[in-house]
């Protein structure tokens, strides 16, 4: 069923972006699965056409809010709205092990500066932040003891409000354990950032970052 939902999302985008309007027979592409899996999946898709009611943003915030044990996030861009930042801080204050993994090597320098700027208050409040040092990492996933989401969704304003994004919300013992093992491997290959080291970042970064942050919704 999840595969069919992803197919529908693709066909809808194809239909919307076509230069010439065409009617697509969706059912033509529906294939019956050989067998059902043991993971419950729900496809979530969103975009500017749905503003201000953004389902992806709501699901992410709910995952953060309802986490009780751990919350692991991988994102190439960490540019948070105040309410999302506060949700993460409240999670760590109630005893949740909150960890965020970002790339050490960026694909965009300004994104690196903005991501690093967002570290400060999170580190100060007890959230653990890791940078993937072997290379650039572009994975986007969030995992708690309750569920996981893997998709195209960055933790930034553009993903939640300006871009068309999709992901798969999953709940199942095996898939969650597989993703958790993947996180465990990634944490071992990363460098953990401390609040003290963040405070001693390059002086030029400290000068540029507040200015960039004023225009963060444009990047």
Task: Give residue ranges: language-model regions.
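Charged, low-complexity intrinsically disordered terminal segments
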Residues: 1-219
């Amino acid at each position: 069923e999840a595969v069919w939902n992803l197919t529908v999302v693709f066909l809808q985008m194809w239909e919307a972006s076509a230069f010439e309007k065409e009617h697509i027979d969706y059912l033509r592409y529906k294939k019956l699965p050989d067998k059902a899996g043991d993971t419950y999946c729900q496809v979530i898709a969103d975009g500017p056409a749905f503003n201000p009611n953004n389902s992806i943003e709501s699901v992410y915030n709910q995952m953060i809010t309802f986490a009780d044990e751990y919350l692991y996030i991988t994102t190439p861009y960490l540019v948070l709205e105040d309410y999302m930042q506060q949700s993460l801080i409240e999670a760590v204050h109630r005893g949740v092990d909150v960890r965020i993994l970002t790339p050490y090597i960026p694909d965009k320098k300004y994104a690196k500066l903005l991501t690093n700027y967002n570290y400060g208050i999170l580190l100060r409040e007890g959230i653990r932040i890791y940078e993937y040092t072997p290379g650039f990492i572009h994975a986007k996933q969030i995992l708690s003891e309750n569920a996981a989401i893997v998709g195209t969704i960055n933790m930034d304003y553009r993903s939640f409000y300006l871009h068309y994004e999709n992901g798969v919300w999953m709940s199942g013992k095996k898939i969650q354990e597989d993703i958790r093992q993947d996180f465990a491997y990634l944490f071992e290959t990363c460098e953990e950032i401390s609040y003290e080291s963040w405070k001693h970042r390059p002086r030029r970064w400290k000068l540029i970052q507040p200015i960039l942050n004023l225009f963060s919704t444009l990047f």
